[in-house]
Regions:
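Charged, surface-exposed helical/loop "interaction arms" that form contiguous linear patches used
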Residues: 361, 365, 375-378, 431-432, ...
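ATPase nucleotide-binding head domains, primarily ABC-like/P-loop NTPase cores
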Residues: 35-38, 230, 300, 311, ...
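Conserved catalytic alpha/beta cores of large enzymes that bind or transform nucleotide phosphates
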Residues: 164, 169-177, 183-184, 198, ...
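Amphipathic heptad-repeat alpha-helical coiled-coil/stalk segments that mediate oligomerization
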Residues: 204-212, 216-219, 267-268, 283, ...
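Amphipathic alpha-helical coiled-coil segments
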Residues: 322, 329, 339-345, 372, ...
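C-terminal tails and terminal domains of large nucleic-acid-associated
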Residues: 838, 842-880
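Charged catalytic and DNA/RNA-contacting regions of genome-maintenance
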Residues: 1-331, 347, 351-360, 364-456, ...
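Active-site phosphate-binding and catalytic loops of NTP-dependent enzymes
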Residues: 87, 110-119, 251, 390-393, ...
Length: 880
């Protein structure tokens, strides 16, 4: 077998070091891929697969992309979850002795992509590190493009998944133990479209973590970073920082702080509730339009859009901080002219956070610096306008707000107003900034005059009227003579090229002139490149000032947006209390009222407290608006706790520590769970993790199983929630089980409400109004008629309904008295001063045995079998 070529030997050695990456290997004007990389990439990017002779018996599979267009191809691969290692030429191939020196300069992964063109400017691109140690999860999260860096610890799988859902990282790195901690990693990857990689154990050693963090942040002890109580968090943060060093291959100067946080610092919203409330995207379409963020986001900058998204996902629980935000919104709306002028000044500002990252990473081009300069121009007028908005939060923002005049003046004096995109093409540096640049430009300009004079002289000497001096990169400068005049060419012309219609020549004088002109051009281009790099470096030395200012701009943008939304939509400033009262007058759903075009949104009141009004049981037909009303209440509370004004006439909002929702129904087929099992899992999570300060939104609990089982579960859930010794949380509980309305009067904290309807013969009109009292009918047949079911089906349904009414259990429920207790009462319930209410007779053993005998196991799916087993288990429990 022939010997492998030196170039291919180097390729194979490099690929061995980056086995988990697609290797983009620079060869001239292309990045080439070989072997398996080439086969896979050619399919994904629809490139032509060719081959290259490299000393092997067969040609190596090969495909490639032009170097100037590589970013778009890399972004496509990274968005598909791949890692790309970029191996660059480190010297000019023309001057190389032997094989061209090449090195991997960066590894691009889903969580470390800094290309602004490919990222969603309104969303952070997070990478997360998770370490599992001794029943605890350390979590560190970073956005490389903005420098944001956080760490925390959690002690349960549920809390971990909630943090993953909140940050929604595009990439996770973890230790091997994480895969064995009980988390279904594959399911998490598929559901959230996250790339997950388990790294070698040495990444997660506490010694390396400490060393990496201390070195990067230039401190002597971990305590100096406020991390003394975050042992696992330190390991996760150190591993993540080490990984970023290895992939970015630079000093990460934009990561200036590590922020430890406790998940109890903000309102807790679990992943299910985030989806159900459609905070940042809709449940089905996964689109921003139709979400709460869509309504609130009138921001003018990318930084503001990202910060607003963070606010929506992290409502506050500290009253003073909420009121501080409210006062700024109120002040902005008290001076609408100033508010609108600030928004106008914000409009031209580019993404300062991501631009300074590109600058510190030495990847910013000349046009990036002009965008940066034009953004800085807006800072002084914005700061001036802020002086007209006096309040505590404005003062805090102004402390961080640096007008950066020195950097603006540097850019104004150094960089041309319309430079090329490439930093190596020249014409970047302004006249007057550097004497040598001015001198070389003068030589370049005179060179053009010299060329014009030489051309005129040669025409006169030779009599060739159409003689022209031209230039290309292959031949340099040359004299071009058409064929009709080639007989007049003098002997001292040296032919360089023959064309179809012309001949190209050089002369000793032209060659000498070329050396003078091109020498000046080459020196000028090289000098401009060095000066550009120096300007970029000067800016990067001010990264801390710039980041603080960018965050100040983001805050101003967010509050100006919230103020505008409040003004346009007639929102009110809610009172904030810590007594637990939620009192909303004429509340509206912030999203639905913007989506409907033909109807006026019907306003509704809500009142909940910690005593006699903890639980509202809401009955009424489908499509009447129960779910909208409950979500509306949750969103108003959430909006109040981000500091926003709310869609209501008046509102007094008691701070809640968590919002839980259980709405909707869908089978979790991927994990083999039925609608009912999904529902029960979510209810179990709520009952385990809610507190007396939480707000619960529960819709149709128990509908995924039989009527008796469903009613039993719903009844027991209400009992559990209503008992202040067990939970005592404020709850909106929508149900079709009208029997639950009997709990009003039996349980002190329960009150009945229903959605009003108006009957017109066999038809109904939904009034969308919440009224006191329980509904006595579900109007299901009327709703079916509205949906367009055939008349024959509707009539038959009426007949069956009349027969079933004779067996209605409502009267039985009404006659139930409070039981004195169960024979085998659970120990923890002995402390509860509330007796349990029995609904149904106990199940007999013979019934269960007969049902088991009748099951046709051969024709059951695994999912059917699981559901049947669950039903039988409940019946067995009912025996006691």
């Amino acid at each position: 077998m022939a010997e492998v070529s030196p170039m291919m030997q180097h390729y194979l050695q490099t690929k061995e070091q980056y086995k988990d990456c697609i290797l983009f290997y620079r060869l001239g004007d292309f990045y080439e891929m070989f072997f398996d990389d080439a086969i896979m990439v050619s399919k994904e990017l629809e490139l032509t697969l060719t081959g290259k002779n490299c000393g092997l018996e067969e040609r190596a599979p090969m495909c490639g992309v032009p170097f100037h267009a590589a970013d778009s191809y890399i972004n496509r691969l990274v968005s598909n979850g791949h890692k790309v290692a970029i191996c660059e030429q480190m010297e000019d191939p023309k001057q190389a002795k032997g094989i061209v020196k090449r090195e991997v300069i960066r590894v691009v992964t889903p969580g470390t992509n800094t290309d602004m063109a490919s990222l969603d400017e309104a969303k952070n691109n997070y990478i997360m590190s998770i370490v599992y140690t001794e029943d605890k999860y350390g979590i560190a999260t970073c956005d490389v493009t903005t420098g944001d860096f956080f760490t925390t610890e959690v002690d349960t799988e549920r809390k971990l998944l909630d943090e993953v859902s909140r940050f929604n990282p595009s990439e996770i790195i973890c230790n091997e133990a994480f895969y064995m901690s009980g988390i279904d990693v594959d399911d998490m990857k598929n559901r959230l479209s996250i790339t997950v990689s388990a790294l070698d154990s040495w990444y997660f050693s506490d010694g390396l973590a400490n060393e990496t963090l201390l070195s990067h942040f230039h401190v002597q002890t971990i305590n100096a970073l406020g991390l003394e109580d975050y042992e696992s968090g330190v390991i996760a943060a150190g591993a993540l920082l080490k990984y970023l060093y290895e992939t970015q291959m630079n000093s990460l100067d934009n990561i200036l702080e590590l922020h430890p946080y406790s998940i109890g610092k903000y309102m807790i919203i679990d992943s299910s509730s985030r989806r159900n409330l459609e905070l940042v995207e809709t449940l089905r379409e996964k689109q921003k339009r139709g979400s709460l963020l869509w309504v609130l986001d009138k921001t003018r900058t990318a930084m503001g859009a990202r910060l607003l998204r963070t606010y929506v996902e992290q409502p506050l629980i500290e009253k003073s901080e909420i009121i501080k935000r409210q006062k700024l919104i109120e002040a902005l709306n008290a001076n609408e002219i100033t508010r609108d002028e600030i928004r106008e000044y914000l409009n031209p500002i580019y993404d300062l956070e991501r631009l300074i990252t590109r600058i510190t990473y030495q990847s910013a081009n000349p046009r990036d610096l002009i965008a940066f300069r034009d953004s800085l121009k807006m800072l002084p007028p914005i700061k001036q306008q802020l002086s007209d908005i006096p309040c505590e939060l404005t003062d805090e923002i102004n402390e961080e707000f640096d007008e950066l005049k020195d950097i603006y003046e540097l850019l104004l004096s150094s960089i041309e107003d319309e430079p090329p995109i490439s930093q190596r093409d020249g014409d970047i540096i302004k006249a007057g900034y550097n004497e040598e640049v001015d001198r070389l430009r003068d030589a370049k300009t005179k060179g053009k005059t010299w060329l014009a004079e030489l051309e005129a002289g040669e025409r006169e000497k030779t009599g060739i009227k159409n003689l022209r001096i031209k230039y290309n990169k292959v031949f340099g400068y040359y004299l071009e003579v058409t064929n009709s005049f080639k007989d007049m060419v003098p002997d001292y012309y040296v032919r360089k090229q023959t064309l179809t219609n012309a001949e190209r020549y050089i002369t000793p004088e032209l060659k000498e002139l070329e050396d003078t002109i091109l020498g000046a051009e080459d020196r000028l281009t090289s000098l401009e490149y060095e000066l550009f790099r120096d300007v970029r470096k000067q800016i990067s030395c001010n990264v801390s000032r710039i980041q603080k200012t960018a965050r100040a701009i983001a805050q101003i943008d967010v509050f100006a947006s919230l103020a505008l939304v409040a003004s346009q939509n007639n929102y009110c400033k809610p009172k904030i209390n810590e007594s637990g009262i939620i009192d909303i007058k004429n509340g509206r759903h912030p999203v639905v009222e913007k989506m409907i075009t033909n109807d006026m949104f019907i306003e509704n009141d809500t009142y909940l407290d910690q005593h006699k009004n903890r639980i509202s049981i809401i009955t009424g037909p489908n499509m009447a608006g129960k779910s909208t009303y409950m979500r509306q209440t949750a969103l108003i509370v959430l909006m109040a706790q981000i500091g926003s004004f709310v869609p209501a006439q008046t509102a007094n909002i008691g701070i809640v520590d968590r919002i839980f929702t259980r709405v909707g129904a869908s089978d979790d087929l991927a994990s083999g769970q039925s609608t009912f099992m999904v529902e029960m899992n979510e209810v179990a999570n709520i009952l385990r993790n809610a507190t007396a300060k939480s707000l619960l939104i529960l819709d149709e609990i128990g509908r995924g199983t039989s009527t008796f089982d469903g009613l039993s579960i719903a009844w027991a859930v209400v009992e559990h929630i209503s008992n202040p010794k067990l939970l005592g949380a404020k709850t909106l509980f929508a149900t079709h089980y009208h029997e639950l309305t009997e709990l009003e009067g039996k349980l002190d904290s329960v009150n009945n409400y229903c959605i009003a309807v108006k009957e017109k013969g066999d038809d109904i009109v939904f009034l969308r109004k919440i009224v006191k009292g329980g509904a006595d009918r579900s109007y299901g047949i009327q709703v079916a008629k509205l949906a367009g079911l055939p008349d024959s089906v509707i009539e038959r349904a009426k007949e069956i309904a009349e027969q079933l009414l004779a067996n209605d259990i409502t009267d039985t429920v009404k006659s139930i008295s409070v039981d004195t207790g169960h024979k085998h009462k659970k120990e923890h319930l002995d402390e509860v001063d509330m007796t349990q209410i029995s609904l149904f007779d106990t199940v007999k053993d013979d019934d269960i045995i007969n049902e088991l005998r009748s099951i046709d196991i051969g024709n059951m799916t695994p999912l059917d079998a699981l559901n049947k087993l669950y039903q039988l288990q409940n019946k067995v429990k009912n025996r006691w």
